[in-house]
Amino acid sequence: MVLDGFAAHFDAYLENIVREGKSEHTVAAYRRDLEELFALLAQMPSEDVGGVPQDLSRRDFTAALRRLSQRGLNARTLARKLSSWRQYCVWLVERGLLHTDPTADIKPPKQPERVPKALPQEWLNRMLDLPVDGGDPLAVRDHALFELMYGSGLRVSEIHGLNADDVYLDEAWVHVTGKGRKQRQVPLTGKSVEALKNYLPLRQTASDGKALFTGRNGTRLSQRQIQKRLAQWAAQNGDGRHVSPHMMRHSYAGHLLQASRDIRAVQELLGHSSLSTTQIYTKLDFDHIARLYDEAHPRAKRRDE
């Protein structure tokens, strides 16, 4: 079986998405997904796969998905891989290198709706109000990092990409580059402004001096380092619960939505392109909503009666 016809333009495709401004993380994910697809197609019996792009069919791609599913990959991961494959096929079709897109009518595996985990507001306030050792630059940095994470609801990739000149302390907002390199402005809380003012004079800088959050050597903190610092902080000062940047973002969204009830505003602040993505946060804390109902509705039955 020959897959050269389908894989021949792989490098050109990756070069193209780099020119389009896709992040290194995104390009690396596309590379992995497509290399995995080529390997899966190469392992299939010759009667299951065509030899050139024009012969590839819907069946070939559904068979590849089925094999990945048998390996235990969840629906979310399978849907992402299918999306990567589809984008490559569309790119080939647009350039006349593939007759039709064989993935066009393949529906991604249905993903179970998962309500994001949010941290209790009281717990977060207590943790963020813990004393900070002003003589320890890393402790001051971490406090600013965590205040920003919860106070503005940024993704870990967005925090990683922040430069010092993205922060406007006098105006109390931060310029964020999100998914798809979309730009947005997000307000800063008073606590975040205070923490950043304490941190910036202590910030270590490398030669370019751009990164907002840096390590001892002055280089930009990686996403993994940010995740690790947050987990360590929670483990050392909290009650043993696991905490991730994603949970901090979920907490920001859920708490803000509970207080404001303005889902459109929360959508803008989070940088969601679709309202349906934001709507999942309406299910974050049904108990809280039920208590409000009990307290406010004249015909509600008190749950403690």
Swiss-Prot record:
It comes from Neisseria meningitidis serogroup C / serotype 2a (strain ATCC 700532 / DSM 15464 / FAM18). One of its GO terms (biological process) is chromosome segregation. PROSITE patterns: CB, TYR_RECOMBINASE. This is Tyrosine recombinase XerC. Site-specific tyrosine recombinase, which acts by catalyzing the cutting and rejoining of the recombining DNA molecules. The XerC-XerD complex is essential to convert dimers of the bacterial chromosome into monomers to permit their segregation at cell division. It also contributes to the segregational stability of plasmids. Its main location: cytoplasm. It is found in: Cytoplasm. Pfam families: Phage_int_SAM_1, Phage_integrase. Forms a cyclic heterotetrameric complex composed of two molecules of XerC and two molecules of XerD. Keywords: Cell cycle, Cell division, Chromosome partition, Cytoplasm, DNA integration, DNA recombination, DNA-binding. Belongs to the 'phage' integrase family. XerC subfamily.
